[in-house]
Amino acid sequence: MLQAMDQGHLLVNNVDKYVRAGRGVMVYIAFLSDRDSAPITDEALRHAVGVLLHTKIFTHFSPEKMINQPQSLEECPEMDILIVPQASLGGKVKGRSVQFHQLVAKDVGAALYDRFCHFVRVARGVDESRVDANGAPRSEGDAPKAEGWIKYNSRVISGTFGNRQGLRFESEGPFTHMFDI
């Protein structure tokens, strides 16, 4: 699921470490499986990244200029991407409760999530030696300041799989798209 954002703050250590992203998109992701399906491969993950980056649905990325034709994230390389693992997307209502039987096993989901984030960073040209596992700059001087508005800067920031996803974000409106890839 994609959600447009003006800026976002995501908790990555269950306590007090937040990473920040500027104007761009949040990607909520869950990995589902049914008993008859084959395991999710790197090829399938790369395909999902391609759909994410090449689908022309965004018309609002640049407040400085109006655009008439939808653009893809590929056409807006300066926009930030905030990836949030979101197992609740895999919930199905049964009776009066929600069940999550379609989610892949937690260890499989963690590995798929790490690979997906890696493929997004590679596709966006992020130098992974300069960022930590969440995509935050290793150098404090490169990190956005904790106060004020965050300028977009081609960041690919990701939450920590299995942790509580404390999320704060601002958006110009409910611009949300759901993809089943």
From Swiss-Prot:
Its EC number is 3.1.-.-. PANTHER family: D-AMINOACYL-TRNA DEACYLASE 2, D-TYROSYL-TRNA TYR DEACYLASE. Homodimer. It comes from Leishmania major. Disulfide bonds: none annotated. It is found in: Cytoplasm. This is Putative D-tyrosyl-tRNA(Tyr) deacylase 2. GO terms for cellular component: cytoplasm. One of its GO terms (molecular function) is D-aminoacyl-tRNA deacylase activity. Belongs to the DTD family. Highly divergent. May hydrolyze D-tyrosyl-tRNA(Tyr) into D-tyrosine and free tRNA(Tyr). Could be a defense mechanism against a harmful effect of D-tyrosine. It is an enzyme of class 3 (hydrolase). Keywords: Cytoplasm, Hydrolase.
